[in-house]
UniProtKB/Swiss-Prot annotation:
<dbReference type="GO" id="GO:0019825">
    <property type="term" value="F:oxygen binding"/>
</dbReference>
<keyword id="KW-0274">FAD</keyword>
<feature type="binding site">
    <location>
        <begin position="206"/>
        <end position="209"/>
    </location>
    <ligand>
        <name>FAD</name>
    </ligand>
</feature>
<feature type="site" description="Influences the redox potential of the prosthetic heme and FAD groups">
    <location>
        <position position="387"/>
    </location>
</feature>
<protein>
    <recommendedName>
        <fullName>Flavohemoprotein</fullName>
        <ecNumber>1.14.12.17</ecNumber>
    </recommendedName>
</protein>
<dbReference type="InterPro" id="IPR001433">
    <property type="entry name" value="OxRdtase_FAD/NAD-bd"/>
</dbReference>
<feature type="binding site">
    <location>
        <begin position="388"/>
        <end position="391"/>
    </location>
    <ligand>
        <name>FAD</name>
    </ligand>
</feature>
<dbReference type="InterPro" id="IPR012292">
    <property type="entry name" value="Globin/Proto"/>
</dbReference>
<feature type="active site" description="Charge relay system">
    <location>
        <position position="137"/>
    </location>
</feature>
<keyword id="KW-0408">Iron</keyword>
<keyword id="KW-0521">NADP</keyword>
<dbReference type="GO" id="GO:0046872">
    <property type="term" value="F:metal ion binding"/>
</dbReference>
<feature type="binding site">
    <location>
        <begin position="268"/>
        <end position="273"/>
    </location>
    <ligand>
        <name>NADP(+)</name>
    </ligand>
</feature>
<dbReference type="InterPro" id="IPR008333">
    <property type="entry name" value="Cbr1-like_FAD-bd_dom"/>
</dbReference>
<keyword id="KW-0216">Detoxification</keyword>
<dbReference type="GO" id="GO:0046210">
    <property type="term" value="P:nitric oxide catabolic process"/>
</dbReference>
<dbReference type="GO" id="GO:0071500">
    <property type="term" value="P:cellular response to nitrosative stress"/>
</dbReference>
Length: 399
């Protein structure tokens, strides 16, 4: 527990953190990676170059400072980050390193304004925050390892099949090398993949949503070719090759306890966790009404459409596809789609009962737009769930 003086000092630093947060986190990463380059095997180097990771960390530090007297308020965020940490292999011994360089960065950027009292308060506060993460992540590691079929950290899998789904997206069917049964996962969860790319100094870790329902003898991911690792998966790995993956993680999951109508809204590769949710809901809650809305450029970029149409044979499932640039073949054929963008009128015509559970996945700008539209329908905030691919930025910062 922190004393009142420490809490008061930490809260007093919130305005300066809001002003200099990204400068501090940028300095933090630069200094830490300079002295500990081995950590580049864990952290996403692309996010470092795009500076999205420093923004996410700055948001987290500011939130922790603002809620330092009521850390329970940010436990959901801690758990969300904890899932990612467990998935990529963050360990307790990493936290003292992070704390050391965070304090160095605060002092470097704030200079004389970072008084001894402020630095001492932040050292104490970081210890409390780190303990919260370590405790939550310890439980997550134990659950991942001790569940039926579970394992610790990374395990070798074989690419049993590659299947092209669209112009940009290919599915990879992954089976464990030891042929042991796979642990169950919750629809909407992801796995981390660790690969060693030729001529790259460090290993690369990326997260991909599981795109099929639980209960299979494989895990499936459906990957858009858009970056160093995804391009390597598309072009550098073939059926029969081996990759390492961590056990499923993530809290963007389907709530089977709810009996409300289910509205799934996605765009592009954001369809991947939605396919898992759709199939799982049809299997486990066959009476639950489902509306599946997906936006794509056109049919050439629309992955997994046939699987959605197969699920839509179930009487409880309705679908709506939106193409912003349909091809002439799309217009001339018998495909059913709405041309343009998802807007308020479009949603009003589709969603008769707004008292539903909403799940949204896609680019940050898409999620922000859909969250706004769904909120304007009168939907309760706690009924709107979303998954941002990449560092966990706040919704307000995602565009």
């Amino acid at each position: 527990m922190l004393d009142n003086k420490t809490i008061e000092i930490i809260k007093s630093t919130v305005p300066v953190l809001q002003q200099h947060g990204e400068t501090i986190t940028g300095r933090f990463y630069d200094r830490m990676f300079q002295d500990h380059p081995e950590l580049l095997n864990i952290f996403n180097q692309t996010n470092q170059k795009k500076k999205t990771q420093r923004t996410a960390l700055a948001n987290a530090v500011i939130a922790a400072a603002a809620n330092i007297d009521q850390l329970g308020n940010i436990i959901p965020v801690v758990k969300q980050i904890g899932h990612k940490h467990r998935s990529i292999g963050i360990k307790p011994e990493h936290y003292p390193i992070v704390g050391k360089y965070l304090l160095i960065a605060i002092k470097d950027v704030l200079g004389d304004a970072a008084t001894p009292d402020i630095m001492q308060a932040w050292e104490k506060a970081y210890g409390v925050i780190a303990d919260a993460f370590i405790g939550i992540e310890k439980d997550m590691y134990e659950q991942a390892e001790e569940q039926a079929g579970g394992w610790k950290e990374y395990k070798p899998f074989v690419i049993a099949k590659k299947e092209r789904e669209s112009k940009e997206i290919t599915s990879f069917y992954l089976k464990p090398e030891d042929s042991k049964p796979l642990p169950e996962f919750q629809a909407g969860q992801y796995i981390s993949i660790k690969v060693r790319i030729p001529d790259s100094e460090y290993t690369h870790i990326r997260q991909y949503s599981l795109s099929d329902m639980p209960g299979k003898d494989y895990y499936r991911i459906s990957v858009k070719k858009d970056g160093v690792v995804s391009s390597y998966l598309h072009d550098g790995l073939q059926e029969g090759d081996s990759i390492e993956i961590s056990a499923p993680a993530g809290d963007f999951v389907l709530d089977h306890a709810s009996q409300k109508d289910l509205v799934l809204i996605s765009a592009g590769v954001g369809i991947t966790p939605m396919i898992s949710m759709l199939k799982t809901s049809v299997s486990k809650q066959p009476e639950r009404q489902i509306l599946f809305i997906h936006a794509a450029k056109n049919s050439e970029y629309h992955a997994l459409r046939h699987e959605v149409e197969e699920a839509a044979k179930h009487s409880a499932v309705k679908t709506a596809f939106v193409y912003r640039e349909p091809t002439e073949e799309d217009r001339a054929g018998d495909l059913h789609f709405h041309e343009g963008q998802i807007d308020q009128q479009f949603l009003k015509e589709l969603i008769a009962n707004t008292d539903a559970d909403y799940y949204i996945c896609g680019s940050p700008s898409f999620i922000t737009a859909m969250h706004k539209l769904v909120s304007e329908l009168g939907s309760a905030p706690e009924s709107i769930h979303y998954e941002l691919f990449g560092p966990q930025l706040s919704l307000a910062q995602s565009v």
